[in-house]
């Protein structure tokens, strides 16, 4: 693992040096290039915009596809015609820098600015004036009239990529003039022709009215969704926020209170009212996406039909989005590769108009064993920056669900519009309470994790898995508990702890146990030690299993199969994990949690605790138990 991290770090350094210019000469050249671009005039900026438009599916060539050169809309072609003439008196020429035609339909106008100029207010006067003064001979190309505006969609751009710190000076500013209360706002990339046509076919006012008056009886059908009161309230609060015109809504619901079924009810309600065209269900792990898809295929909603039989759903391994697609399930990492990290994104900002974010507390990677993908980010701030970018890339309303709201969560989604806490759920009888934790200490922990001067310690090489010749300590060495099994390996210590833990567990019972390890190697040692401890009692090896991202050689399908086995079968009864099972996994029979690591993140810790809160009447579960081996508390 350490060697792999080192190799990836070196690769990352090379990539970043090439991309951003680490040497003084490269930085100077880059600075000169940026300075030169800031001095570009409008004509030069339009050449840059041409390329951006072509990547989004438009024919664009500011020099040749020009009104004055005879370019006109053509059936079957999507052309951004430059310098389109209008009767506007804003300038003596009266032309818009670009007019967007889908076939022969005029759907949008755009004004380009020099890269150094602000663009935020350009739409307010200039582009609106163009839209209100279309020439009489061009009226047949228009698709409606809205409060005097003959073109529905307006843009302004100076060619610069969007930066939050330079909000008014960057991005592509967009306004839908069909509703008077709409305000201009920046988007990250150009809409494709199909994006604009889908927007054009949507009546948000009528859809909001339908949404507010929607029949919720399907939510309480005992043979179908069968939602609880608090789940219905959560959907109602999200609906109110959407009808009120809010672009974000955060639902804070305790782990184990049925967020996935709540999401299913929300999705179905939104699609039935036609409020949204296409919904993205965003998860941060493949296993969570698979679990959601299972629910979508299992729960009956209307006339004994499940969601996947009523609407087209794209599973987590299906990237092809078409006009019929209504729901797509994807991971954050997958979307990053298809949008902001892609040279040529295959998803435009209009691909989804509602994003539902599962487990929106995401962002505790510093306290986790990072995946190879995560190692390629500079740090937690860099990861969260890209997480936010991919969520905000789409021109969509965002509804997020989390059990553990944190600062970075509310910064993106705002304060919760609805909260249903763990304590409320316990009082209402929907979750189980927990016993006081058992604290297990050893002499080594009690003695402050200290090695004495003169002791001989074997050195472990993680790259070769070999123990090297012992070294005599020249001085005392102290270790923090968080470094156990990360920097120091103590087999005797681990064995003593697990011997004590084993007295509380019965691998042959219906009560399942989840043990949290420091890393994958530590998980292997725990499994091996427990099997050794239980061997004299005739316990099957299958009763104890490691379930991490490296199980079955990292084969995702096999990992999902093992997770389902843990949930549905007698064995494994004891699962040892690192981070794979910390969030979102629904195994009601988990009764015991064992912490063989120090947890530095409140968010992660609460998510871990949530693995054992679900009701499981089949085994008579009334509470959860915890064994913590984290040293002095």
Language model: regions and residue ranges:
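Post-DEXD/H (motif II) to motif III coupling segment of the RecA-like Helicase ATP-binding lobe
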Residues: 365-446
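Interdomain helical connector at the RecA1-RecA2 junction of SF1/SF2 helicase-like NTPases
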Residues: 410-510
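ATP-dependent helicase/translocase motor core
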Residues: 1-278, 287, 291-303, 324-327, ...
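Conserved RecA-like P-loop NTPase helicase motor core
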Residues: 143, 334, 364, 377, ...
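Conserved RecA-like ASCE ATPase "motif II neighborhood" in helicase/translocase motors
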Residues: 327-386, 563, 577-578
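Conserved C-terminal RecA-like helicase domain
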Residues: 326, 465-469, 475-575
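Conserved RecA-like ASCE P-loop NTPase motor core of nucleic-acid helicases/translocases
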Residues: 251-252, 276-285, 511-519
């Amino acid at each position: 693992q350490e060697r792999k991290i080192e190799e990836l770090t070196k690769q990352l350094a090379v990539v970043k040096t090439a991309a951003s210019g680490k040497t003084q000469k490269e930085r100077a050249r880059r600075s000169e290039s940026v300075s030169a671009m800031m001095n570009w005039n409008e004509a030069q900026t339009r050449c840059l915009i041409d390329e951006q438009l072509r990547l989004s599916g438009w024919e664009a060539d500011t020099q040749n596809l020009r009104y004055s050169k005879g370019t006109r809309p053509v059936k079957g072609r999507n052309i951004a015609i430059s310098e389109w003439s209008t009767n506007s008196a804003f300038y003596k020429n009266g032309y818009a820098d670009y007019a967007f035609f889908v076939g022969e339909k005029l759907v949008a106008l755009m004004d380009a600015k020099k890269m150094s100029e602000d663009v935020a207010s350009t739409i307010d006067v200039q582009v609106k004036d163009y839209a209100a003064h279309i020439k009489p001979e061009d009226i047949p190309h228009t698709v409606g009239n809205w409060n005097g505006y003959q073109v529905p969609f307006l843009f302004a751009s100076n060619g610069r990529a969007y930066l939050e710190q330079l909000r008014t000076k960057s991005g592509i500013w967009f306004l839908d003039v069909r509703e008077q209360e709409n305000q201009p706002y920046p988007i990250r990339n150009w809409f494709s022709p199909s994006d604009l046509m889908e927007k054009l076919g949507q009546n948000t006012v009528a859809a909001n009215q339908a949404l507010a008056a929607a029949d919720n009886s399907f939510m309480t059908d005992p043979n179908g969704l069968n939602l609880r009161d608090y789940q219905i309230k959560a959907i109602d609060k999200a609906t109110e926020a959407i009808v009120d015109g809010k672009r974000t809504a955060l639902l804070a619901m305790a782990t184990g209170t049925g967020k996935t079924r709540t999401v299913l009810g929300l999705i179905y309600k939104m699609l039935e009212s036609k409020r949204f065209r296409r919904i993205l269900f965003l998860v941060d792990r493949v296993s969570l996406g698979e679990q959601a898809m299972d629910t979508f295929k299992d729960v009956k909603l209307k006339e004994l039909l499940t969601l996947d039989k009523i609407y087209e759903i794209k599973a987590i391994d299906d990237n092809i989005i078409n006009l019929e697609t209504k729901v797509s399930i994807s991971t954050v990492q997958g979307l990053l590769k298809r949008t902001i990290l892609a040279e040529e994104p295959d998803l435009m900002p209009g691909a989804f108009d509602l994003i539902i974010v599962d487990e929106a507390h995401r962002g505790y990677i510093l306290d986790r064993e990072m995946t190879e993908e995560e190692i390629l980010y500079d740090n937690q701030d860099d990861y969260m920056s890209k997480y936010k970018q991919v969520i905000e890339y789409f021109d969509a309303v965002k509804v997020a669900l989390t059990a553990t709201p944190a600062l970075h969560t509310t910064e993106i989604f705002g304060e919760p519009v609805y909260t249903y806490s763990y304590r409320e759920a316990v009082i209402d009888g929907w979750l189980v309470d927990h016993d006081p934790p058992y604290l297990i200490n050893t002499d080594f922990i009690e003695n402050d994790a200290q090695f004495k001067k003169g002791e001989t310690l074997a050195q472990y090489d993680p790259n070769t898995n070999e123990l090297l010749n012992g070294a005599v300590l020249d001085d005392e060495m102290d270790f923090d508990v968080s470094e156990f099994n990360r920097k120091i390996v103590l087999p005797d210590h681990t064995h003593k702890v697990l011997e004590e833990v084993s007295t509380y567990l019965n691998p042959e019972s219906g009560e399942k146990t989840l043990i949290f390890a420091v890393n994958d190697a530590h998980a292997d040692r725990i499994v091996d030690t427990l099997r050794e401890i239980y061997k004299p009692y005739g316990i099957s090896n299958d009763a104890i299993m490691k379930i991490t991202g490296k199980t079955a050689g990292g084969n995702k399908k096999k990992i999902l199969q093992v997770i389902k086995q843990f949930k549905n079968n007698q064995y494994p009864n004891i699962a040892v994990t690192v981070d794979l099972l910390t969030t979102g996994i629904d195994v009601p029979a988990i009764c015991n949690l064992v912490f063989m690591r120090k947890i530095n993140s409140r968010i992660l810790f609460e998510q871990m605790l949530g693995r054992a809160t679900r009701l499981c009447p089949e085994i008579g579960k009334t509470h959860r138990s915890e064994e913590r081996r984290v040293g002095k508390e």
